[in-house]
């Protein structure tokens, strides 16, 4: 049962054996060892084992591109017991594991690779589109599933989702803008169905078009675009009516017609004719794109000059 000697008992037994001229002392039989508080047969130990085994019955499989399984191997790392055989399930460790799970599978703002219709392959970072695990909600759900000993397959709870779990998680239907070449494409099921030269934001900190992976947030007809307030005048720096508005960011970037532009493409955007961040399009192309887009359609904005975050 134990290897710790009870010196008080041992001394008494040695004296007793010496007095009685006994030459061999069996320390175990004579109770010279300190008995453990619990043995494998103790009810408290059995109860603790039963409790832990209930947790270890659970197996939660997250259906990702490659399944992620939370089973007894991992759950056992979250279980412990104290000197009184009270079992503890460390929920904080579950939450920490879920945070790491989110870091692994979240794609919002991450660096992804895209090959343009012209064959150019570039990295694109930033933006608002992609997978984002609801770590708090999913950690709570995982804890409950483990406590119940559930054996289930499931998708994690997401704050937002994307088209696919592939590396290019925007799928095969999306709008793409190349700031460097001042050109955009609308691609449906992998095929270009619309393309045109554009004028993007003037490359200054306050007007540059942000690069990254976004999505269409809003579609509106006959909208007046309003700039920031000029402190000197107390009025917006611009108020511009457009026929077709396709919002990409809540900070005011989007696709729209720009009938005031006499030309598109080239280096126009580098002059004062560059936009305030929006993607200016010919009227007929803006109308066609508007008719084909839907809210949620991914938008990839790239630039060979480097990544520029949304303002």
Regions found by a protein language model. Name each.
Residues 1-240, 244, 293-295, 300-310:
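Surface-exposed, secretory/extracytoplasmic low-complexity segments enriched in Ser/Thr/Asn/Gly/Pro
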């Amino acid at each position: 049962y134990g290897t710790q000697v009870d010196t008080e008992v041992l001394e008494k037994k040695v004296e007793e054996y010496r007095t009685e001229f006994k030459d061999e002392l069996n320390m175990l039989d004579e109770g010279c060892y300190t008995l453990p508080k619990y043995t494998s047969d103790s009810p408290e130990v059995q109860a603790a084992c039963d409790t832990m085994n209930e947790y270890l019955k659970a197996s939660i499989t997250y259906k990702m591109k490659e399944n992620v399984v939370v089973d007894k191997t991992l759950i056992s790392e979250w279980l412990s017991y104290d000197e009184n055989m009270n079992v503890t399930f460390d929920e904080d460790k579950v939450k920490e594991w879920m945070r790491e799970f989110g870091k692994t599978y979240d794609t919002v703002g991450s660096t992804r690779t895209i090959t343009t219709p012209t064959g150019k392959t570039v990295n694109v970072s930033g933006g608002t589109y992609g997978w984002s695990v609801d770590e708090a909600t999913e950690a709570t759900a995982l804890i409950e599933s483990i406590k119940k000993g559930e054996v289930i397959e499931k998708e994690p709870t997401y704050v937002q989702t994307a088209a696919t779990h592939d590396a290019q998680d925007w799928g095969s239907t999306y709008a793409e803008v190349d700031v460097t070449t001042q050109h955009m494409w609308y691609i449906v099921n992998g095929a270009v169905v619309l393309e045109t030269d554009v004028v993007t934001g003037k490359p200054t900190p306050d007007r540059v078009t942000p690069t990254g992976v976004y999505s269409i947030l809003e579609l509106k007809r006959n909208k007046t675009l309003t700039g920031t307030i000029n402190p000197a005048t107390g009025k917006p720096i611009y108020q511009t009516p457009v026929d077709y508005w396709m919002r990409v960011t809540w900070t005011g970037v989007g696709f729209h017609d720009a009938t005031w532009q006499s030309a598109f493409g080239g280096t126009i955007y580098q002059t004062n004719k560059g936009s305030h961040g929006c993607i200016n399009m010919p009227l007929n192309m803006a109308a066609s794109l508007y008719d084909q887009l839907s809210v949620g359609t991914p938008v990839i904005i790239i630039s060979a000059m480097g990544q520029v975050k949304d303002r």
